């Protein structure tokens, strides 16, 4: 059963997800700012096996600040960004939340890379923030409970 669906602006690329997201984040890293053209990007992470994409996407890869590969996928027709994957977050794909048919169906719980916050961009003050990535690998972080990751907002640097 499909729980979430979305598509790019022109409709050439779409997806369906058959599970709840593992986590939903706002990211204020420089890569997300550059690729979104905004102060942050919002991502819903799903297990790769739960998401089915349709249409052909173009890809652009960069090296992340921890040395892994970040691959962004987008529609070659309208340029709409669709998905993001990290080499160190195997088994997950992050879907651009703005592409969801019902973007209000998800709620971000955490802001990453808050040390790079842009003063004119506003996210809910109630969200937990972390200055960069938690000091675990992406894979370990994704497997941990999100509320454990939120302890970083209180200044505790260990999980």
Task: List each language-model region with its residue ranges.
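A short Gly-Trp-Pro
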Residues: 1-7, 12-159
């Amino acid at each position: 059963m499909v729980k979430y669906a979305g598509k790019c602006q022109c409709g050439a690329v779409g997806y369906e997800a058959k599970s709840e997201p593992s986590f939903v984040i706002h990211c204020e890293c420089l890569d997300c700012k550059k690729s979104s053209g905004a102060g942050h990007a919002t991502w819903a992470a799903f297990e790769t096996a739960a998401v089915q994409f349709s249409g052909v996407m173009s890809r652009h890869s960069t090296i992340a600040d921890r040395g892994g590969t970040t691959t962004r996928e987008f529609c070659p027709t309208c340029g709409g960004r669709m998905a993001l994957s990290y080499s160190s977050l195997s088994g997950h794909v992050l879907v651009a939340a703005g592409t969801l048919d019902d973007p209000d169906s998800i709620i971000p719980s955490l802001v990453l890379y808050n040390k790079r916050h842009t003063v004119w961009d506003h996210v809910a003050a109630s969200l937990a923030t972390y200055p960069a990535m938690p000091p675990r690998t992406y894979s370990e972080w994704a497997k941990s409970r999100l509320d454990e990751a939120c302890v970083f907002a209180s200044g505790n640097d260990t999980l």
